[in-house]
């Protein structure tokens, strides 16, 4: 009777064993085979390939040549795509740095300093604490007058007891509110101005308040803003474009004067060598020439002598 199942060497009947699964061969006279009355040939284990024989995955670049020195086909060598530096999937990192405020040096406009050189740079936060009963407006104005930097009001929290607001629909009039009002938002700015040589501050503030009954009032601050509880005001100081233009050092132009050309006289020519004077009374003594001709003397050994030419001298006879 033919069946589609395969009898495993262990004696059980199961489905087809996958090719990756291999079992060690058992002798044909095992008890299981004798019990089933079957005689199966021993199974041969496949020889491992060259890559599996090592048992470890090779690290590094793939091999370009086989063990016998023959080059591998191009299809067997995997192609490794080189990653382009500074780009991620076609996206330029430099453009992203410029978008979020990075410089080419890697620094970012941060809180508490940042990088100088751009308009609105050097942004520094400050926290102003206003005590109970003090005027918030005067504290902020006095803080802005401590230096040449411009300030902007970011936020504030606390409760006020008295506020004077300027309403746009009241034809330039003001309204004063008394009671306990919680600050919802406080914003504004103060910048340094110069008019006819005198420096001052220009700017203003606007506030939104919530009453105890839930009513919300707001407008431009036109007078007092008295604190009912300690209030924290967060402001930021920065340098404007006008101040930055004045702070830029001007480069001094240095003009190099042309060097004067001095005429150098040529060196004097050396005088002709002076001849030695021979004295007939003392032939072995020669009179030295003048002092200026000493440097032009030459060694007597270097001068060629003619042995055929002699000097005849007549000496007096005693």
Swiss-Prot record:
Residues 1-76, 241-318 are annotated as: Disordered. Residues 243-256 have a biased composition (Basic and acidic residues). One of its GO terms (molecular function) is minor groove of adenine-thymine-rich DNA binding. Residues 56-68 bind DNA. A motif (Bipartite nuclear localization signal) lies at residues 56-64. Residues 120-259 form the PPC domain. It is found in: Nucleus. One of its GO terms (cellular component) is nucleus. Pfam families: PCC (PF03479). PROSITE patterns: PPC. InterPro entries: AHL (IPR039605), PPC_dom (IPR005175). Residues 288-312 have a biased composition (Polar residues). Residues 264-274 have a biased composition (Pro residues). CDD domains: DUF296. Signal peptide: none annotated. The PPC domain mediates interactions between AHL proteins. Transcription factor that specifically binds AT-rich DNA sequences related to the nuclear matrix attachment regions (MARs). PANTHER family: AT-HOOK MOTIF NUCLEAR-LOCALIZED PROTEIN 7, AT-HOOK MOTIF NUCLEAR-LOCALIZED PROTEIN 9. This is AT-hook motif nuclear-localized protein 7. It comes from Arabidopsis thaliana. The gene is AHL7.
């Amino acid at each position: 009777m033919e069946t589609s199942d395969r009898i495993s060497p262990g004696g059980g009947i199961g489905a087809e064993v996958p090719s990756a699964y291999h079992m060690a061969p058992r002798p044909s006279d095992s008890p299981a085979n004798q019990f089933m009355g079957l005689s199966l040939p021993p199974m041969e284990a496949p020889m491992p390939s060259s890559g599996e024989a090592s048992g470890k995955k090779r690290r590094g670049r793939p091999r370009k040549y086989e063990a016998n020195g023959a080059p591998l086909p191009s299809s067997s060598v995997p192609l490794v795509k080189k990653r382009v530096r500074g780009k991620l999937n076609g996206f330029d990192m430099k453009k992203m740095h410029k978008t979020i405020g990075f410089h080419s040096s890697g620094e970012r406009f941060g809180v508490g300093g940042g990088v100088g050189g751009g308009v609105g740079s050097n942004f520094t936060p400050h926290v102003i604490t206003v005590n109970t009963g003090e005027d918030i407006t005067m504290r902020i104005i006095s803080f802005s007058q401590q230096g040449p930097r411009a300030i902007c009001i970011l936020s504030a929290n606390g409760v006020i007891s008295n506020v004077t607001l300027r309403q746009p629909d009241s034809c330039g009039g003001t309204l004063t509110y008394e009671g306990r009002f919680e600050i919802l938002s406080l914003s504004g700015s103060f910048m340094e101005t110069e008019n006819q040589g005198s420096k001052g501050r220009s700017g203003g503030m606007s506030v939104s308040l919530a009453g105890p009954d839930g009513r919300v009032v707001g407008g431009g601050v036109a007078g007092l803003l008295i604190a009912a509880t300690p209030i924290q005001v967060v402001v930021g100081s920065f340098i404007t474009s006008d101040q930055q233009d004045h702070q830029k050092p001007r480069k001094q132009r240095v003009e190099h004067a042309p060097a004067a050309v001095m005429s150098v006289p040529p060196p004097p020519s050396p005088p002709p060598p002076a001849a030695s004077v021979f004295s007939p009374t003392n032939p072995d003594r020669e009179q030295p020439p003048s002092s200026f001709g000493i440097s032009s003397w030459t060694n007597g050994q270097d001068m060629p002598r003619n042995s055929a030419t002699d000097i005849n001298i007549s000496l007096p006879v005693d």
